[in-house]
Protein backbone atom coordinates (compact mmCIF):
# COMPACT_ATOMS: atom_id res chain seq x y z
CA UNK A 1 0.00 0.00 0.00
CA UNK A 2 1.32 3.43 -0.92
CA UNK A 3 2.13 5.94 1.78
CA UNK A 4 -0.55 8.66 1.88
CA UNK A 5 0.45 12.09 0.63
CA UNK A 6 0.12 14.68 3.39
CA UNK A 7 -0.24 18.46 3.12
CA UNK A 8 0.11 20.88 6.03
CA UNK A 9 -2.09 23.97 5.71
CA UNK A 10 -1.31 27.26 7.43
CA UNK A 11 -1.41 30.99 6.89
CA UNK A 12 -0.69 34.38 8.31
CA UNK A 13 -2.68 35.57 11.31
CA UNK A 14 -6.05 37.04 10.24
CA UNK A 15 -5.03 40.50 11.46
CA UNK A 16 -2.33 40.50 8.75
CA UNK A 17 -5.07 40.31 6.09
CA UNK A 18 -6.70 43.57 4.90
CA UNK A 19 -10.11 42.33 6.14
CA UNK A 20 -8.90 41.02 9.51
CA UNK A 21 -11.53 38.78 11.09
CA UNK A 22 -14.38 39.96 8.82
CA UNK A 23 -15.22 36.72 7.04
CA UNK A 24 -18.19 38.42 5.36
CA UNK A 25 -15.80 40.70 3.43
CA UNK A 26 -15.77 39.80 -0.27
CA UNK A 27 -11.97 39.50 -0.23
CA UNK A 28 -12.13 36.89 2.53
CA UNK A 29 -14.85 34.98 0.68
CA UNK A 30 -12.71 34.98 -2.46
CA UNK A 31 -9.70 33.78 -0.48
CA UNK A 32 -11.73 30.90 0.94
CA UNK A 33 -12.87 30.00 -2.58
CA UNK A 34 -9.26 29.99 -3.82
CA UNK A 35 -8.19 27.93 -0.80
CA UNK A 36 -10.98 25.43 -1.52
CA UNK A 37 -9.99 25.26 -5.18
CA UNK A 38 -6.33 24.61 -4.33
CA UNK A 39 -7.29 21.92 -1.80
CA UNK A 40 -9.46 20.20 -4.44
CA UNK A 41 -6.60 20.35 -6.96
CA UNK A 42 -4.26 18.81 -4.39
CA UNK A 43 -6.80 16.03 -3.79
CA UNK A 44 -6.90 15.35 -7.54
CA UNK A 45 -3.10 15.21 -7.50
CA UNK A 46 -3.12 12.53 -4.80
CA UNK A 47 -3.07 14.37 -1.48
CA UNK A 48 -5.28 12.38 0.90
CA UNK A 49 -4.36 13.85 4.28
CA UNK A 50 -4.51 17.48 5.33
CA UNK A 51 -2.94 18.62 8.58
CA UNK A 52 -3.83 21.80 10.45
CA UNK A 53 -2.51 23.40 13.63
CA UNK A 54 -6.05 24.45 14.60
CA UNK A 55 -5.50 28.22 14.43
CA UNK A 56 -8.55 30.48 14.09
CA UNK A 57 -7.63 31.72 10.65
CA UNK A 58 -6.48 29.73 7.64
CA UNK A 59 -6.25 26.51 9.67
CA UNK A 60 -9.93 26.74 10.58
CA UNK A 61 -10.94 27.73 7.04
CA UNK A 62 -9.01 24.79 5.57
CA UNK A 63 -10.37 22.34 8.14
CA UNK A 64 -13.93 23.37 7.35
CA UNK A 65 -13.26 22.94 3.62
CA UNK A 66 -11.67 19.51 4.09
CA UNK A 67 -14.44 18.35 6.43
CA UNK A 68 -16.95 19.44 3.78
CA UNK A 69 -15.12 17.41 1.13
CA UNK A 70 -14.98 14.41 3.46
CA UNK A 71 -18.77 14.06 3.25
CA UNK A 72 -18.34 12.68 -0.28
CA UNK A 73 -14.70 11.50 -0.20
CA UNK A 74 -14.42 9.04 2.68
CA UNK A 75 -10.73 8.36 2.03
CA UNK A 76 -9.84 12.00 2.70
CA UNK A 77 -8.46 12.70 6.18
CA UNK A 78 -8.20 15.80 8.35
CA UNK A 79 -5.55 15.57 11.06
CA UNK A 80 -5.78 18.27 13.73
CA UNK A 81 -2.77 19.06 15.90
CA UNK A 82 -3.81 21.53 18.57
CA UNK A 83 -1.12 23.55 20.35
CA UNK A 84 -2.65 22.42 23.68
CA UNK A 85 -5.98 21.19 25.02
CA UNK A 86 -7.39 24.54 26.15
CA UNK A 87 -6.49 26.46 23.01
CA UNK A 88 -9.94 27.87 22.26
CA UNK A 89 -10.82 28.85 25.85
CA UNK A 90 -10.52 32.61 25.24
CA UNK A 91 -11.72 32.67 21.63
CA UNK A 92 -14.90 34.49 20.64
CA UNK A 93 -17.91 32.16 21.06
CA UNK A 94 -18.61 31.92 17.31
CA UNK A 95 -15.01 30.82 16.66
CA UNK A 96 -15.03 28.42 19.60
CA UNK A 97 -18.17 26.73 18.25
CA UNK A 98 -16.58 26.28 14.82
CA UNK A 99 -13.37 25.01 16.45
CA UNK A 100 -15.17 22.27 18.36
CA UNK A 101 -17.21 21.31 15.28
CA UNK A 102 -13.93 21.02 13.36
CA UNK A 103 -12.53 18.70 16.02
CA UNK A 104 -15.71 16.59 16.19
CA UNK A 105 -15.61 15.96 12.44
CA UNK A 106 -11.87 15.43 11.96
CA UNK A 107 -10.08 12.10 11.55
CA UNK A 108 -7.52 12.60 14.33
CA UNK A 109 -6.93 15.06 17.17
CA UNK A 110 -3.65 15.39 19.02
CA UNK A 111 -2.43 18.04 21.46
CA UNK A 112 1.21 18.94 20.81
CA UNK A 113 2.08 20.69 24.10
CA UNK A 114 0.92 20.96 27.69
CA UNK A 115 -1.22 23.97 28.60
CA UNK A 116 1.00 26.98 29.27
CA UNK A 117 3.94 25.74 27.21
CA UNK A 118 5.77 28.64 25.53
CA UNK A 119 5.50 28.84 21.74
CA UNK A 120 2.82 26.12 21.65
CA UNK A 121 1.33 27.40 18.37
CA UNK A 122 4.76 27.33 16.72
CA UNK A 123 5.31 23.79 17.99
CA UNK A 124 1.97 22.75 16.48
CA UNK A 125 2.95 24.29 13.13
CA UNK A 126 6.33 22.52 13.25
CA UNK A 127 4.60 19.22 14.01
CA UNK A 128 2.33 19.42 10.96
CA UNK A 129 5.23 20.58 8.77
CA UNK A 130 7.39 17.66 9.94
CA UNK A 131 4.62 15.17 9.15
CA UNK A 132 3.75 16.70 5.78
CA UNK A 133 5.10 16.09 2.32
CA UNK A 134 4.25 19.66 1.32
CA UNK A 135 2.85 22.90 2.76
CA UNK A 136 -0.06 24.98 1.47
CA UNK A 137 0.26 28.47 2.95
CA UNK A 138 -1.81 31.62 2.61
CA UNK A 139 0.93 34.17 2.91
CA UNK A 140 1.93 37.59 1.62
CA UNK A 141 5.70 37.46 1.31
CA UNK A 142 5.80 41.20 0.57
CA UNK A 143 4.81 42.09 4.14
CA UNK A 144 7.72 42.23 6.55
CA UNK A 145 7.91 39.32 9.01
CA UNK A 146 6.75 40.14 12.53
CA UNK A 147 8.35 37.23 14.34
CA UNK A 148 4.96 35.56 14.72
CA UNK A 149 4.53 31.80 15.01
CA UNK A 150 3.26 31.82 11.43
CA UNK A 151 6.33 33.66 10.11
CA UNK A 152 8.65 31.32 11.99
CA UNK A 153 6.70 28.27 10.76
CA UNK A 154 7.00 29.28 7.11
CA UNK A 155 10.74 29.84 7.57
CA UNK A 156 10.91 26.43 9.26
CA UNK A 157 9.13 24.77 6.31
CA UNK A 158 11.64 26.39 3.95
CA UNK A 159 14.51 25.22 6.15
CA UNK A 160 13.08 21.70 6.08
CA UNK A 161 13.04 21.97 2.27
CA UNK A 162 9.33 21.26 2.00
CA UNK A 163 7.58 21.95 -1.28
CA UNK A 164 5.42 25.04 -0.81
CA UNK A 165 2.26 26.19 -2.51
CA UNK A 166 1.72 29.83 -1.57
CA UNK A 167 -1.56 31.67 -2.03
CA UNK A 168 -1.27 35.46 -1.88
CA UNK A 169 -4.18 36.57 0.35
CA UNK A 170 -5.01 39.79 -1.52
CA UNK A 171 -4.03 39.00 -5.11
CA UNK A 172 -5.22 35.35 -4.94
CA UNK A 173 -2.25 34.28 -7.03
CA UNK A 174 -0.48 31.01 -6.36
CA UNK A 175 3.21 30.24 -6.43
CA UNK A 176 4.62 26.73 -6.37
CA UNK A 177 8.04 26.45 -4.76
CA UNK A 178 9.77 23.11 -5.19
CA UNK A 179 11.70 21.67 -2.28
CA UNK A 180 14.75 21.58 -4.53
CA UNK A 181 14.77 25.35 -5.14
CA UNK A 182 15.43 28.40 -3.03
CA UNK A 183 12.07 29.82 -1.85
CA UNK A 184 13.11 33.47 -2.14
Question: Where is each model-derived feature located?
Answer:
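Acidic/glycine-enriched connector segments
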Residues: 1-184
Amino acid sequence: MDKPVCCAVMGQHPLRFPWGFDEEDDRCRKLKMELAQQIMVLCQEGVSQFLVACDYGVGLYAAEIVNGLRTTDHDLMLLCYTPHEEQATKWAPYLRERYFTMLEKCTLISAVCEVGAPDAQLHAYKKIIDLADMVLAVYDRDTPPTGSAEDKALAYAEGQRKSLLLIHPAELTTKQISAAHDAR
